[in-house]
């Protein structure tokens, strides 16, 4: 067994990122909702400015996990933070510390932007993962709800200038 390595993803890693995101959608039983593509990852993640960054965990050049994140700013804190959009570790690689390692590497990367916190959301059906996050120090914020605007309502607001 080779050493587990973490690296900042490059455009050449877009197919591996896509493959891991596809597996994540399957694990969450959300394949029908997943409409990402390698092209979209290349376009939005590796252009200037990038819409997201990614950290990959691998062993012997085989991708085992990833963290996809972007920077945000809290007006209430007056500080920058990270929002982890997706964190995924392949089932056979769980329990090896990759999830915490991916978060740690994202935080290291975020030091370039003076981040002081990490924000993320967990699917309601993903109780095992919720326990993982709580074990490493995340706390649940009960005074917020996640809302989404897309499709026709989004188009109506965009078109009504």
Give the residues covered by each predicted segment:
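A short, internal acetyl-CoA/4′-phosphopantetheine-binding micro-motif in the GNAT/acyltransferase core
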Residues: 87-94
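Conserved beta-strand in the GNAT
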Residues: 56, 62-71, 83
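C-terminal "cap" of GNAT-fold acetyltransferases
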Residues: 116-161
């Amino acid at each position: 067994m080779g050493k587990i390595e973490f690296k900042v993803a490059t455009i050449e890693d877009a197919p591996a990122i896509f493959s891991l995101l596809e597996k994540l959608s399957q694990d969450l039983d959300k394949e029908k909702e997943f409409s990402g593509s390698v092209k979209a990852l290349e376009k939005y993640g590796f252009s200037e400015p990038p819409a997201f960054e990614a950290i990959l965990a691998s062993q012997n050049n085989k991708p085992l996990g990833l963290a996809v994140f972007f920077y945000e700013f809290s007006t209430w804190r007056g500080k920058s933070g990270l929002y982890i959009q997706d964190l995924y570790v392949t089932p056979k690689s769980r329990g090896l510390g990759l999830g915490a390692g991916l978060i740690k590497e994202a935080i290291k990367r975020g030091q370039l932007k003076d981040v002081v916190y990490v924000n993320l959301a967990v699917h309601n059906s993903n109780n095992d993962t919720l326990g993982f996050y709580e074990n490493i120090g995340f706390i649940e914020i009960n005074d917020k709800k996640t809302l989404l605007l897309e499709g026709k309502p989004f188009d109506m607001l965009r078109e009504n200038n």
